[in-house]
A protein has these predicted regions:
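Sec-dependent N-terminal signal peptides
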Residues: 4-13
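A general "mature secreted/periplasmic domain" signal
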Residues: 18-142
Length: 142
């Protein structure tokens, strides 16, 4: 029984491996990571800035998917993926019961990117690998 628990703990530790890319010694805004199929890579983005992911020169992006597509622009170009947070429009619908019956009122509003609501995942599939990312919006002063 102890062997089964130990094996399960070891397997779970690989599932939650988060790879925080190392920053360049020349410019802290540039970061890099070595691919490991068992890692989730963290990307910290800022509002008003474009981030770029560069994959191997022999890789081509086949597909991208994110859990919050309304809040992120993803632009693919060969082995490059450009990422930018964006505001999105949504509607608030309220139903009211009055003496006459039910009525609905809706109001459209824009939700600006913010660190609390803009956390999601990103999956990139290339012709060679599948990458999984944690996509986070960080404060401007980070």
């Amino acid at each position: 029984m102890k062997k089964i628990i130990l094996i399960n703990l070891l397997l779970c530790s690989f599932i939650w491996a988060l790879n925080i890319p190392k920053t360049s010694t020349f410019d802290k805004r540039i970061a890099y990571a070595i691919y490991n199929a068992n890692d989730v890579f963290q990307i910290n983005a800022k509002n008003g800035y474009v981030s770029v992911l560069e994959f191997g020169t022999d890789e081509r992006i086949i597909n991208t998917a994110t859990g919050f597509a309304e809040g992120w622009d993803l632009i693919e170009k060969d082995n490059l993926l450009f990422i930018k947070p964006k505001a999105y429009k949504t509607q608030l619908v309220q139903q009211e019961n009055n003496n006459i019956g039910e009525s609905q009122a809706s109001q459209e509003f824009v939700l600006d990117p913010n660190p609390h609501d803009w956390k999601t995942n990103l999956i990139v599939i290339t012709n060679l690998n599948t990458y999984v990312f944690d996509l986070k919006l960080v404060n401007q002063n980070n």
